[in-house]
From Swiss-Prot:
Positions annotated to bind ATP: 53-60
Keyword Disulfide bond: no
Key word Cell wall biogenesis/degradation present: no
Name of protein: Tetraacyldisaccharide 4'-kinase
Catalytic function, reaction form: a lipid A disaccharide + ATP = a lipid IVA + ADP + H(+)
Metabolic or biological pathway, per its Swiss-Prot or TrEMBL entry: Glycolipid biosynthesis; lipid IV(A) biosynthesis; lipid IV(A) from (3R)-3-hydroxytetradecanoyl-[acyl-carrier-protein] and UDP-N-acetyl-alpha-D-glucosamine: step 6/6
Length: 338
């Protein structure tokens, strides 16, 4: 929201509510620290990647990059998530064929992109419990979101920021902050990663750009350059649709129409009724819900992947934090076998 970027009249009007939000956050954190509220710790390292601000900043692409990095080292990695926006509240393992309505779009995307075990549950600690019971040789658990979910203890915390930084620096609803910043939260983070071009404060950086190709529902690829000159429609049901549209235009694509939809949007038949006979570009996150959906046969629906590439120093710092934690695991535990 643009209101969150400045301290205008609306933000000032909401400022008293932000103070109440801040007090509630501090009280909740104190209850967990004192042990009044239970916080679960597990026998393997837990990495939490999330946002201090509301809205997308690249958290899910980071989770996928973390999983791939750890898998490349031979580690068995599992992912847990609350599965925001899903219709079911049960704890379940996400498979390639799990309906997105049951898993949530982000867990479905992570599963398809990494093939790591992915579990969703209303309480993330329950998801970890099921993950470790099903895959006892798991070496590292990566939690998609959950910086503010203190019921799950973690060993490494990573916060992601885009060009908005912390916006106007105020708490919800007057600003974008989910918790006070700076302060104990900034000092307590292990790693900060900036996905924008202009980092607002110290931290590691990551490249974020579109792939050179788009993917059809059957898995075939088409170069973005081959789409120039076509009548194109772009849609995005993500936190910042305009960023996706801007990246498409930067690749030389002319968008006849753009459709900005709410994050985690549940697509209905009417959403794309005006796009019949056209080539429609969407994000991978939207594609997990749209591919195979009835009534879209008249569209050429293409997903454009996002290439997320943190700087090497980020992974070096992560490995340095993780090494002593992995050394405490039983010998050979958590490594993939050939």
């Amino acid at each position: 929201m643009r209101t969150w970027l400045t301290r205008g009249w609306l933000a000032r009007l909401l400022w008293p509510l932000a103070q109440l939000h801040g007090q509630a956050v501090r009280l909740r954190r104190a209850l967990y620290r004192s042990g009044i509220l239970e916080s679960c710790r597990f026998g393997v390292p837990v990495i939490v990647a999330g946002n201090v601000v509301a809205g997308g900043a690249g958290k899910t692409p980071l989770v996928m990059a973390l999983v791939r990095h750890l898998q490349a080292q031979g580690l068995q990695v599992g992912v847990v998530s609350r599965g925001y926006g899903r219709s079911s509240h049960e704890s379940l393992e996400v498979s390639i064929g799990t309906p997105v309505a049951q898993s949530g779009d982000e867990p479905a995307l992570i599963k398809r992109a990494t093939n790591a075990p992915v579990f969703v549950a209303k309480k993330r600690a329950d998801a970890v419990r099921r993950l470790l019971a099903t895959y006892p040789s798991t070496a590292v658990v990566v939690c998609d979101d959950g910086l503010q979910h203190y019921a799950l203890q973690r060993d490494i915390e990573i916060a992601v920021f885009d060009d908005r930084g912390v916006g106007n620096g105020w708490l919800l609803p007057a600003g974008p902050l989910r918790e006070p910043w700076p302060g104990r939260r900034q000092q307590g983070l292990d790693l900060v990663l900036h996905t924008g071009l202009k980092p607002a404060f110290e931290g590691f950086t990551s490249g974020r750009q579109l792939a050179d190709h788009a993917i059809a529902a059957d898995g075939s690829q088409i170069a973005l350059t081959a789409l120039r000159g076509r009548t194109l429609v772009a849609l995005a049901g993500i936190a910042n649709p305009e960023a996706f549209f801007a990246m498409l235009r930067a690749r030389g694509l002319v968008l006849e129409q753009t459709l900005s939809l709410p994050d985690h949007h549940d697509f209905g038949a009417g959403d794309l009724a005006a796009c019949a006979g056209k080539t429609v570009l969407c994000t991978e996150k939207d594609a997990v819900k749209l591919f195979g959906k009835p009534g879209l046969a008249s569209l050429q629906l293409l997903a454009v992947p996002l290439v997320f590439s943190p700087e090497p120093a980020f992974f070096a710092a992560l490995d340095a934090l993780l090494a002593p934690l992995l050394s405490q695991l039983p010998s050979g535990h958590g490594y993939q076998t050939a």
